[in-house]
Curated annotation (Swiss-Prot):
Residue intervals passing through the bilayer: none
Function: The coatomer is a cytosolic protein complex that binds to dilysine motifs and reversibly associates with Golgi non-clathrin-coated vesicles, which further mediate biosynthetic protein transport from the ER, via the Golgi up to the trans Golgi network. Coatomer complex is required for budding from Golgi membranes, and is essential for the retrograde Golgi-to-ER transport of dilysine-tagged proteins.
Protein name: Coatomer subunit gamma-2
Subunit structure and binding partners: Oligomeric complex that consists of at least the alpha, beta, beta', gamma, delta, epsilon and zeta subunits.
Keywords carried by this UniProt record: Cytoplasm, Cytoplasmic vesicle, ER-Golgi transport, Golgi apparatus, Membrane, Protein transport, Repeat, Transport
């Protein structure tokens, strides 16, 4: 086997260093050593050592050439003549790792088949594993009979080997493995723990795509036939899956199989108890009554003598405390004793759980205990502590001083990027949400950037300092920290510091002369970006730049959120041809468009006119449509195009004619662009037009129609219908559509169409114009700043009952769909089991009116959802309209 470790004494360091037995081995030398496989008198120990080295090389990523692999493979097959059991097991490993080709497999198959029928169970089990890894589907059918017998073999080692091989083969030959269901079901009843475990895993994988079959499997096994603790843990997971799926389809009542999960809490095996407790705590919408038995057993484990049980219990309780803190309060006394646990991971989880469940009076005591062990735990656990402190501070804002001091102290200690970022993010959130914490928080951040090794965090703090520092009682005290960055840091941080100085100069008149002096010094910086920024800001603050004609313009330029999606700007800049005319940033589309999943899949159809832009870069869509519509005389006088919708399908897939419609919204008009495709080779369509019935849309009046002269097979074309509406009116309605045309037969052999045609029509799906069509999805980079910059007088607040909903997520999605706005900062995602949620939306209403919405959702009953809607906009009337849209939605 492998040589023993070599221990060498280092005279200089006077300490022992341990070297790997494989240190310095080379592939060529090992391949030479492999010649021992050909010796007439095999040395089993020597052969095992060589195979170990070969396996090491393979697992380290060394590759063998085709010739080398073939030579090693054939040499290895000669070792089957040895009777040494240890060497035989190494041979199995070597063959499996070499992954021989189909031709080579045939050579070794006979030896493996012989071992598979051997009287030695260890040979049989290993031969099955190797065979199933190297054979193809053709050879599999030849040994299928042996594998089915092995599954029900009396020896558990052989049976487990066959079942594990079945799990592997299910990925490559699922149809073959599915024929083994009867044998696998028999193995599930085995008394051997591992056999039952592997059999249950394989049986579930065979049936996993059939929900009814999985439900029946769980029903039959929860009656008590499973004795293996490992298999019981699997069964608990499958039961949880069935409960989740059934809960989605039921409207209430008792959960199926919950009694089984509860009974597992009384199992003899600790792993089963923990698995059941974890499963109960992770159920969707779990109630306090359902949690109680799980919390009780977890509380018992907190005082266990086994560290792994204490860790598992406190980690589960930590997760529960995030959603059901009151349910965990009974465990607080037990968890306080764990703060001094020798295992720092357990102590960390205990104290963070207490932070989530504790009251205001216990904060100072917990802070003192936490200080003692922060240096002893890994960064990942430190991040957990920081997040818990942030939540606690927001929960008890009066305790911000002690919590902020704790954060600033650990910020000065050693730590990685993610850990430091978590602390900085927490301090920034506390400054934003607790006004009294602003001064001390900004001071701590300034001290941190004096010795910060992370460029990202330095620029983040400088940006935040530029927004919040000028609003403090003494802004001048921050200038020294900012200018130090210009002198001492790299180019990226220096550029950020220049921008921060300009923000102070724009908002604090008394500091402007000093800022001018500092910015002029930056004109001699060695970096282009720093010099350019300094030049721009000097002209801007001095009133020389065109953007800085008024103080409001300057502040908007410096502090306004960058509302243009970067991907749109990038595309426009790529299309911009350098000329004497400057680049017009107003030409860049503001709308944030996400491509639907269906559009990402290849449909096999040709793109339809300008709609083909959807398959390319998304931001060019509006420009393409605007160019097309302005070239049509009937629509040229409609003004600037506000928005173009995504295509709405009006026909089923695979029908004779494919039609979708794009809604183009103007201030006083709506143009419907019907993209048509003829999918019948034997037909030519002429004079194609869509007849639109607007009887259910009385706020619209048809003003123009543009027909399509000819629509050959598989050659997309467009027809248009334009409607007029009152400017400033949120006109909505439903339109019914009929495709009318003259159809002419086409000779397939010549491609010639008949002279005579027949008038025909084709019924299309109805189309709706909704309130969301008048809203552009435009994101903001910083919602809080954008909200505060809007006039509070424009704010309108009201509360609404949304009725019974399946979940908060469904309610959030429905309101976003009604408004057609862009979710900000990922707030469209609702955490599972949440009973409240805040969603932030932004957009531009027709007329280029910026709108911001803050939605607060809460569950007022079992499934009753209440919502508070706050709107701010550039026009108070639009704020009122947003409320009307929601009220009527």
């Amino acid at each position: 086997m492998a040589q023993p470790l070599v221990v060498k004494k280092d005279d200089d360091l006077d300490e022992e260093e341990y070297y790997s037995p494989f240190l310095g081995i080379e592939k060529g030398a090992v391949l030479q050593e492999a010649r021992v496989f050909h010796d007439p008198q095999l040395d089993a120990r020597r052969c095992c050592q060589v195979i170990t080295k070969l396996l090491y090389l393979l697992n380290q990523g060394d590759t063998f050439t085709k010739v080398e692999a073939t030579e090693v493979f054939f040499a290895t097959t000669k070792l089957f003549q040895s009777k040494d059991a240890g060497l035989r097991r190494m041979v199995y490993l070597m063959i499996k790792e070499l992954s021989p080709s189909a031709d080579e497999v045939i050579i070794v198959t006979s030896s493996l088949m012989k071992d598979m029928n051997s009287k030695t169970d260890m040979y049989r089990a290993n031969a099955i594993r190797v065979l199933c890894r190297i054979i193809d589907s053709t050879l599999l059918t030849q040994i299928e009979r042996y594998l089915k017998q092995a599954i029900v073999d009396k020896n558990p080692v052989v049976a487990s080997a066959a079942l594990v091989s079945g799990i592997y083969l299910l990925q490559t030959s699922p149809e073959v493995v599915k024929r083994w269901s009867n044998e696998v079901q028999e193995a599930v009843q085995s008394r051997a723990a591992l056999v039952q475990f592997h059999a249950l895993a394989l049986l579930h994988q065979i049936r996993q795509n059939d929900r009814l079959a999985v439900s029946k499997l769980v029903t039959s096994l929860t009656r008590g036939s499973v004795r293996s603790p490992l298999a019981q843990c699997l069964l608990i997971r499958y039961t949880s899956q069935v409960i989740r799926e059934s809960s989605m389809n039921s409207q209430g009542g008792d959960r199926p199989f919950f009694d089984f999960l509860e009974s597992c809490l009384r199992n003899k095996a600790e792993m089963v108890i923990l698995e059941a407790a974890r499963a109960i705590t992770e159920l969707n919408g779990v109630t306090s009554r359902e949690l109680t038995p799980a919390i009780t057993v977890l509380q018992l484990f907190l005082s266990s003598s086994k560290p792994v049980l204490r860790f598992a219990a406190v980690r589960t309780l930590n997760k529960v405390a995030s959603t059901h803190p009151l349910a965990v309060t009974n465990c607080n006394i037990d968890m306080e004793s764990l703060i001094s646990d020798q295992n720092r991971s357990i102590a960390t989880l205990a104290i963070t759980t207490l932070l989530k469940t504790g009251n205001e009076s216990s904060v100072d005591r917990l802070m003192k205990q936490m200080t003692n062990f922060m240096s002893d735990i890994a960064d990942e656990f430190k991040i957990v502590v920081v997040e818990a402190i942030r939540s606690l501070c927001l929960k008890f804002p009066l305790k911000y001083r002690s919590l902020m001091n704790f954060l600033s102290n650990i910020l000065r200690e050693e730590g990685g990027f993610e850990y430091k970022k978590a602390i900085v993010d927490s301090i920034i959130i506390l400054i934003r949400d607790i006004p009294d914490a602003k001064e001390s928080g900004l001071f701590h951040l300034c001290e941190f950037i004096e010795d910060c090794e992370f460029t990202y965090m330095s620029t983040q703090i400088l940006h935040f300092l530029g927004n919040e520092g000028p609003k403090t009682s003494d802004p001048s005290k921050y200038i020294r920290y900012i200018y130090n960055r210009v002198i001492l840091e790299n180019a990226t941080v220096r550029a950020s510091a220049v921008s921060t100085l300009a923000k102070f100069g724009a908002l604090v008149d008394s500091l402007k002369p000093r800022i001018f002096v500092l910015l002029r010094r930056c004109l001699f910086d060695g970096d282009d970006e720093v010099r350019d920024r300094a030049t721009l800001y000097l002209k801007l603050l001095g009133g020389e730049a065109t953007v800085g004609e008024t103080e409001k313009d300057v502040n908007e330029f410096l502090f306004g959120s960058f509302d243009i999606p970067l991907v749109n700007l990038e595309t426009s800049l790529q299309n911009y041809e350098p000329s004497e005319a400057p680049f017009d940033i107003s030409s860049v589309s503001l709308e944030t468009k996400s491509q639907p999943l269906a559009e990402k899949k290849t449909t096999g159809k040709k793109p339809t006119g300008p709609a083909s832009a959807l398959s390319g870069p998304v931001p060019t869509v509006d420009a393409s449509y605007e160019k097309l519509l302005s070239s049509i005389p009937e629509f040229a006088g409609f003004g600037k195009l506000f928005k173009s919708s995504a295509p709405v399908e009006l026909t089923e897939a695979e029908t004779e004619y494919s039609v979708n419609v794009v809604k183009h919204i103007y201030d006083g008009h709506v143009v419907l662009q019907y993209n048509c495709t003829n999918t019948i080779p034997e037909q030519l369509l002429e004079e194609v037009v869509v007849f639109v019935d607007a009887s259910e849309a009385d706020e619209f009046s048809e003003v123009a129609t543009k027909s399509l002269r000819s629509l050959p097979y598989d050659s997309p074309g467009q027809t248009f219908v334009a409607f007029e509406k009152l400017e400033g009116v949120l006109a909505t309605g439903k339109f019914s559509n009929i495709l009318k045309f003259i159809v002419k037969e086409v000779d397939p052999s010549t491609g010639e169409a008949d002279d005579d045609g027949v008038e025909d029509e084709y019924q299309l799906e109805d189309l709706e114009i909704t309130s969301a069509d008048y809203m552009l999805k435009v994101g903001v980079s910083n919602f809080r700043n954008a909200w505060e910059s809007m006039d509070p007088e424009s704010e309108r607040v009201d509360e609404y009952g949304l009725g019974a909903r399946e979940s908060l997520a469904e309610a959030v999605s429905a309101v976003i769909g009604i408004l057609g706005m862009q979710p900000c900062e990922g707030t469209d995602v609702v955490p599972s089991n949440s009973r409240s949620h805040t969603c932030l939306l932004s957009g531009v209403f027709i007329g280029n009116v910026k709108v911001l919405v803050r939605l607060s959702f809460g569950l007022s009953g079992p499934k009753e959802v209440a919502m508070k809607l706050a709107v701010r906009s550039d026009d108070p009337e639009i704020s009122d309209k947003i409320h009307e849209i929601v009220a009527n939605g």
